[in-house]
Amino acid sequence: MTTLAIDIGGTKLAAALIGADGQIRDRRELPTPASQTPEALRDALSALVSPLQVHAQRVAIASTGIIRDGSLLALNPHNLGGLLHFPLVKTLEQLTDLPTIAINDAQAAAWAEYQALEGDITEMVFITVSTGVGGGVVSGGKLLTGPGGLAGHIGHTLADPHGPVCGCGRTGCVEAIASGRGIAAAAQGELAGANAKTIFTHAGQGDEQAQQLIHRSARTLARLIADIKATTDCQCVVVGGSVGLAEGYLALVETYLAQEPAAFHVDLLAAHYRHDAGLLGAALLAQGEKL
């Protein structure tokens, strides 16, 4: 049975057909609409899936935000244009006339990455550092989603009580500092207004401010990982996302984590499926895996 998997992120929408063998084919992308209207997202999703839906028997959605009863609740509205209560499952069922499930994108990615691990691992945490910072937790070999879908939203834990205000309404969240949006927001002078990708480019060219911004992000993530180790005693942490997978970033995180006491050290791995983890995880869950 073929699954039409959809990944809804803060900057892009992706869709692909995934067979029972887990192979991805006919992958497509569109920019996430900047408009805050449900109509804009519906139209973009329609354009994305219409060439693919005839080849699928079901739909699986991995989306940023909290997924509750098939609808999108944006913990940080800035990451998805302020959409609230957008009926993801209902919308895709109407567009495709196919049975549909939906799950948070980082939770979906965590499940895919867990399947790729070697050895006897039952405790794993996945972190995505991209437009925002999200996560997924596997404990006892099972994916944790929580009764309200909030499990794994580790980007909204405290990093700095005097830090910037996060889009979720809290002050000093990890996401407000370590994410691509957080890196860009802290840029000043010649880098003011630059996005995270541009800042990474400048850092590679030796720009001191750009390097400091990236180190600040990596240091914040390392402290989060130490907190996660203390909370879950996980056997490994897998890091993905456009920032998390940027050249040299994970090595920086490892350097800062090594400065923490040994009890908080944990193996760090780069995401095996890279940017396709959300798509694959959603498809796996649609194949009958229990949440």
From Swiss-Prot:
Q: What is its EC number?
A: 2.7.1.60
Pathway(s) where this gene product acts: Amino-sugar metabolism; N-acetylneuraminate degradation; D-fructose 6-phosphate from N-acetylneuraminate: step 2/5
- Stretches that traverse the bilayer: none
Residues bound to ATP: 5-12, 132-139
At which positions is Zn(2+) bound?
156, 166, 168, 173
**One Pfam family, short name:** ROK
Q: Does the keyword Transcription apply?
A: no
Catalytic activities: an N-acyl-D-mannosamine + ATP = an N-acyl-D-mannosamine 6-phosphate + ADP + H(+)
Keyword Aminoacyl-tRNA synthetase in the entry? The reply is no
Domain of life of the native organism: Bacteria
Q: Which GO terms describe its molecular function?
A: ATP binding; N-acylmannosamine kinase activity; zinc ion binding
Keywords carried by this UniProt record? ATP-binding, Carbohydrate metabolism, Kinase, Metal-binding, Nucleotide-binding, Transferase, Zinc
Do you know which InterPro entries this protein is assigned to? ATPase_NBD, ManNAc_kinase_bac, ROK, ROK_cs
One GO-annotated biological process of the protein:
N-acetylneuraminate catabolic process
Give the function comment from the record.
Catalyzes the phosphorylation of N-acetylmannosamine (ManNAc) to ManNAc-6-P.
UniProt xrefs under PANTHER family:
N-ACETYLMANNOSAMINE KINASE, ROK (REPRESSOR, ORF, KINASE) FAMILY
Q: Relate the assembly described in the record.
A: Homodimer.
UniProt similarity note = Belongs to the ROK (NagC/XylR) family. NanK subfamily.
Q: What protein does this entry describe? A: N-acetylmannosamine kinase
User: What's the encoding gene here?
Assistant: nanK
